[in-house]
């Protein structure tokens, strides 16, 4: 419970400032996310006669083709820290001009994935953009947090874009490696998914020391409570396959 509280306090300060004037709300509604990718999130369960070793072997085989980096920008597996590797999430991300949903499903089946796990292959295509604090090309993700959130009435993406930039600038100045994925099914939707990717094991220590108790963190925390609410938050060990 304590860890959850720490995560929640930190992540609510990444959201934005919003004016109380209706004119500002109207202008903010014109600011839309600049989506870069198509995304699919598939929730899966390992079958009773299978295990994590089988899944690891399968994924090692998967990266050998036929789908490659030319087809997939990123393919990640999220494993909850709270269970014994019985459930996981596939996160498939491709460029905005590609949609390989059916090719991906077919490749999984052809390589024998059906014997290892069962997934809810939701065909709803999501769109996203990624933001980095610093160059992370040489780093591996240590863990991720997935938050499912919803804007409050009269609030939207435009209300907190400026604060996102300010937050990333702070991460850069502190040299803290961090990545966010902002995901929506539709830019006009009130619902969105926020994925935080952390690249150092002592990330929480860095944040709690330099940010949590600062004036800026508390100020943006209060602003977030006016903008949106997060319905749930889960922590995952993250494996980048492609």
For the regions a protein language model found, what residue spans apply to each?
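Short S/T/G/P-rich N-terminal loop/turn motif that feeds into the first structured element of a domain
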Residues: 17-217, 226-242
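Classical Sec-dependent N-terminal signal peptides that target proteins to the secretory pathway
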Residues: 1-21
């Amino acid at each position: 419970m304590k860890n959850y509280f720490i995560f929640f306090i930190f992540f609510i300060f990444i959201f934005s400032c919003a004016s109380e004037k209706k004119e500002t709300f109207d202008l903010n509604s014109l600011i839309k996310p600049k989506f870069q990718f198509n995304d699919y999130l598939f929730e899966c369960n390992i079958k009773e006669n299978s295990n994590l070793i089988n899944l690891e072997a399968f994924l090692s085989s998967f990266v050998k083709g036929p789908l490659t980096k030319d087809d997939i920008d990123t393919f990640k597996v999220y494993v909850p820290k709270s269970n014994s590797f019985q459930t996981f999430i596939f996160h498939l991300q491709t460029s905005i001009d590609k949609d390989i949903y059916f090719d991906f499903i077919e490749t999984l089946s052809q390589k024998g994935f059906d014997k290892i796990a069962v997934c809810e292959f939701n065909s709803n295509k999501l769109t996203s953009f990624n933001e980095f604090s610093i160059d992370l090309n040489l780093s591996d993700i240590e863990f991720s947090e997935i938050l499912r959130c919803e804007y409050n009435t009269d609030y939207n993406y435009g209300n907190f874009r400026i604060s996102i930039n300010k937050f990333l600038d702070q991460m850069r100045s502190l040299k803290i490696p961090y990545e966010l994925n902002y995901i929506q099914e539709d830019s006009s939707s009130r619902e969105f998914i926020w994925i935080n990717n952390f690249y150092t094991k002592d990330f929480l220590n860095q944040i709690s020391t330099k940010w949590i108790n600062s004036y800026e963190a508390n100020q943006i925390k209060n602003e977030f409570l006016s903008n949106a609410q997060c319905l749930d938050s889960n922590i995952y060990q993250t494996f980048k396959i492609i």
